[in-house]
UniProtKB/Swiss-Prot annotation:
This is ATP synthase subunit delta. F-type ATPases have 2 components, F(1) - the catalytic core - and F(0) - the membrane proton channel. F(1) has five subunits: alpha(3), beta(3), gamma(1), delta(1), epsilon(1). F(0) has three main subunits: a(1), b(2) and c(10-14). The alpha and beta chains form an alternating ring which encloses part of the gamma chain. F(1) is attached to F(0) by a central stalk formed by the gamma and epsilon chains, while a peripheral stalk is formed by the delta and b chains. Its main location: membrane. GO terms for cellular component: plasma membrane; proton-transporting ATP synthase complex. Keywords: ATP synthesis, Cell inner membrane, Cell membrane, CF(1), Hydrogen ion transport, Ion transport, Membrane, Transport. F(1)F(0) ATP synthase produces ATP from ADP in the presence of a proton or sodium gradient. F-type ATPases consist of two structural domains, F(1) containing the extramembraneous catalytic core and F(0) containing the membrane proton channel, linked together by a central stalk and a peripheral stalk. During catalysis, ATP synthesis in the catalytic domain of F(1) is coupled via a rotary mechanism of the central stalk subunits to proton translocation. This protein is part of the stalk that links CF(0) to CF(1). It either transmits conformational changes from CF(0) to CF(1) or is implicated in proton conduction. Belongs to the ATPase delta chain family. PANTHER family: ATP SYNTHASE DELTA CHAIN. It is a peripheral membrane protein. Coiled coil: none annotated. It comes from the Bacteria. GO terms for molecular function: proton-transporting ATP synthase activity, rotational mechanism. It comes from Sinorhizobium medicae (strain WSM419) (Ensifer medicae).
Amino acid sequence: MPVADTSQLISGVAERYASSLFELALEAGSIEAVGADLTRIQALIDGSADLKRLIVSPVFSADDQYKAISALVEKFGVSGLVGNFLKVVARNRRLFVLPGIIRAFRLLAARHKGEITADVTSAHALTPAQETELKAALKGVTGKDVAVNVTVDPSILGGLIVKVGSRQIDTSLRTKLSTLKLALKEVG
């Protein structure tokens, strides 16, 4: 199976799980709380190489993953809907799509609130003040509330790459240097 087909398959699985979680959260009236718990889980994944390995490695059995996730949700106080959901995902050996599930849930929650989502790539993590300022600037441009998904990619060297729908604004230092390099080649 080509790589593109595999990523679509993973995306489909993530969207189905996220949709199920969203419907349960909507019924319970806890979309915000579930979103906050998922944000905490994503932060834990981003901050721990061992947890990332547990999620993506097929070496761990479903039972090992279940026990680890159960301990994690208990230790960090992630209970109720998200805690049970994570256990089901682990039991079904679908932890490898957890980051995709979290992204898809955020999109569903944003759509439910009438927000649009901007994917932002930055060379460094944004401070809460920078994120708030970026949201305000994007709201001024789009006229809608904007939810921001920030990805850190040191290879862009500096600046931001912002994607909103089909539009992309690339102010990264890497792109500026590439443009300058091309301009110098044309001159020389």
